[in-house]
């Protein structure tokens, strides 16, 4: 099955998106509070599966498309369909060169155009079940009324799509799709054009789960990598241009940098902890995102040196709230979380 068939075009109802935007505006406030919250991650040795900054020093030449690089060190990129792609300079200020997809129209009426670097990595065979993909990305809008979607899609080595994280160019919402045929589902999160975002996709191939954060905020938590029993290995992670009106694409584009995939011998996806609010009595309301059924210890500190365990929680459904009623006793209160062995 080719990539045109395994990608999905399903949309989201405007009524549902409007409701979710109310949540999104509240979560922007949370970002300022959560900046004090330290996430916990084990210092286990990592293996770099693939990493590039698209720099000239790596062999990337701005005079060629991304999939047509002349250097033997950079010519491994592959594409499906046709469309604009290549190398830009300083679109992220001070970051050197970046890759991009979009802007120039396809030579035919294809709906999907994707570029990727073949990985063909087998996490379980290599005893590295934890795989993290991170990328700095930005979407610049069309100057016309034709707005398209851009997404990141993860495939196995057989070319079967596991899941996608989609950035809707019309509604400015972030949505996701699994391999269950149900189409795109809302994450409740929005994005802005012409703004940089750090996207992190974390996968646990041992437990068949994936999560996503955008600028450190969780947008997808503990969803199945595959619902169809597909082979659990990592074939590639694609940048995808989804053209809404075949034959009439927008001149929008997505550029990206610091494209990196690392693998760890972890047993679970590291948790994400947020401070949701502070109650009138001074208590802090925390929200922890983790893997379903696992226990996590929430720790607190007033100086970032000495840490005290304040609560062990169980993420029964992957998300759990905790109210720290002792927070009012401290002028400063920092939090972190770790999986309880």
Where on the chain are the PLM-derived regions?
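Flexible glycan-contacting loops in extracellular carbohydrate-active proteins
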Residues: 223-257
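Bacterial N-terminal signal peptides
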Residues: 28-39
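Extracellular carbohydrate-recognition regions
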Residues: 45-80
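Short, aromatic/His-centered strand-loop micro-motif at the edge of beta-sheets
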Residues: 175-198
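Short, composition-biased motifs enriched in small/polar/acidic residues
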Residues: 266-341
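Extracellular beta-strand elements of beta-rich domains used
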Residues: 54, 257-261
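Short tryptophan-centered beta-strand motifs in secreted/extracellular beta-sheet-rich domains
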Residues: 133-135, 195-205, 210-212
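Secretory/extracellular carbohydrate-interaction modules
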Residues: 57-60, 85, 91-174, 265
């Amino acid at each position: 099955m080719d990539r045109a068939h395994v990608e999905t075009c399903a949309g989201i109802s405007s009524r549902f998106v409007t409701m979710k935007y109310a949540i999104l505006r509240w979560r922007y406030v949370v970002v300022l509070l959560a900046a004090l919250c330290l996430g916990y991650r084990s210092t286990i040795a990592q293996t770099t599966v693939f990493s590039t900054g698209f720099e000239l020093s790596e062999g990337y030449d701005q005079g060629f498309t991304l999939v047509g690089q002349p250097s033997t060190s950079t010519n491994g990129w592959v594409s499906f369909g046709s469309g604009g792609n290549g190398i830009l300079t300083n679109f992220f200020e001070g970051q050197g060169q970046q890759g991009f997809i979009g802007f120039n129209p396809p030579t035919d009426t294809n709906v999907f155009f994707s570029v990727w670097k073949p990985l063909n990595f087998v996490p379980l065979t290599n005893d590295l079940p934890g795989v993290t993909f991170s990328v700095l990305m930005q979407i610049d809008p069309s100057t016309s009324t034709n707005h398209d979607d851009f997404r990141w899609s993860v495939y196995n080595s057989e070319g079967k799509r596991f899941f996608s994280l989609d950035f809707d160019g019309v509604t400015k919402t972030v949505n996701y799709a699994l391999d269950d045929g149900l189409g795109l589902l809302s994450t409740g999160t929005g994005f802005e054009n012409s703004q940089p975002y750090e996207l992190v996709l974390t996968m646990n191939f041992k437990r068949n789960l994936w999560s996503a954060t955008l600028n450190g905020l969780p947008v997808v938590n503990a969803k199945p990598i595959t619902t169809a029993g597909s082979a659990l290995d990592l074939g590639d992670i694609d940048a995808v241009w989804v053209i809404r009106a075949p034959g009439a694409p927008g001149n929008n584009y997505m550029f990206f940098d610091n494209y990196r995939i690392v693998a760890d011998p972890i047993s679970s996806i590291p948790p994400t902890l947020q401070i949701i609010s502070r109650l009138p009595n001074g208590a802090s309301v925390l929200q922890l995102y983790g893997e379903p059924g696992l226990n996590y210890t929430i720790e607190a500190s007033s100086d970032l040196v000495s840490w005290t365990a304040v609560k062990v929680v169980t993420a029964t459904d992957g998300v759990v709230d905790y109210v720290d009623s002792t927070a009012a006793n401290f002028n400063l209160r920092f939090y972190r979380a770790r999986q309880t062995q």
